[in-house]
């Protein structure tokens, strides 16, 4: 996601070494998207226009937010799905979250530079992971029956 995400597009123009990495990342993403397997779930932040074009303009199937799954934060995450249903929100806390100051609800956007910043920004929220596990496993069990 480092080279495909909308938040990183500005770095393409300041560091020319990122362009080949972006091409490689888009190629890898496209190969995953078109893999000959029965089910696919790819999670990635919102893509920039160059990456979207390189993967063939395929739009995500769903855009989710942590606040849809019980976390008082905003961080858009896209899902590309094959033979899996869109996730159903499990605990929407958007109204409560919107009462927080912007720098709290968009905490990840305001993180200062640090060695761990990338790791903090790429955290998978437990509520989202739980929804994926329970909802998609149930779908698989239903189709196996």
Question: Which residue ranges define each predicted feature?
Answer:
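Conserved active-site and SAM-binding loop architecture
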Residues: 1-145
């Amino acid at each position: 996601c480092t080279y495909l995400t909308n938040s990183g597009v500005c770095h393409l123009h300041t560091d020319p070494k990122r362009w080949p990495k972006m091409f490689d990342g888009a190629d890898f993403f496209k190969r995953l998207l078109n893999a000959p397997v029965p089910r696919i779930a790819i999670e990635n932040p919102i893509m920039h226009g160059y990456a979207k074009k390189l993967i063939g303009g395929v739009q995500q199937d769903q855009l989710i937010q942590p606040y849809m799954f019980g976390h008082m934060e905003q961080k858009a995450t896209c899902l590309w799905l094959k033979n899996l249903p869109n996730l159903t929100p499990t605990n929407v806390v958007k109204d409560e979250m919107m009462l927080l100051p912007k720098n709290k609800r968009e905490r990840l956007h305001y993180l200062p530079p640090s060695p761990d910043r990338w790791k903090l920004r790429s955290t998978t929220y437990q509520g989202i992971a739980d929804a994926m596990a329970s909802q998609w496993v149930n779908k698989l069990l239903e189709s196996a029956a």
